[in-house]
Amino acid sequence: AYLNPRFHWTDLKVSTEVTSHNRDPNAPPPKLRKYEQARVLGGGSSINGQMANRGAPTDFDEWHDRGATGWRWEDCLPYFKKIERDLDIDDEWHGQEGMIPVRRVPEAQWPGHAKALAEAFERAGYKHLPDQNGFFEDGYFPVTISNQAEQRVSAAIGYLNADVRKRKNLTISTLTQVTELLFDEERRCVGV
């Protein structure tokens, strides 16, 4: 699915060049490159690498400090926990009842290049961390993936199970592009 243009917005472009307020106004605009965004039920979780990566807490706190009210790390962590059902770790950083199972690739299953990288990181003084989404510090760790029994679990698979698909107030329309979201007075989305 990842390479199939039917499952992507093929004309999206983005600049990855850093720009700042003191950029030369006569400089040419930054180059644009293709921006991969899924156009399939389940979104990026249906086509990307099954990674279950959280951003660094300092990034969330910076967004809040720049005006994104409600985006502090402590505001977002409950939602990360609500989403996931961690199959490996049960602690204050992880959820146990969410719809998306997450697990880590055991070191015994790491390919040769990953083991070589781990050895190089170890020699460089980085420590092995059991979890990339736990206490945040520098180190190397097993990859956390949204996968169970060697099967991808996309948002569509996790949330749109057989019981949900039977709901009378749910219509799934693939091959359809949403142009507007309708919200009620409580700012809850009630239609498209």
Per-range role (PLM):
Residues A1-V192:
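N-terminal redox-cofactor-binding region of secreted/periplasmic oxidoreductases
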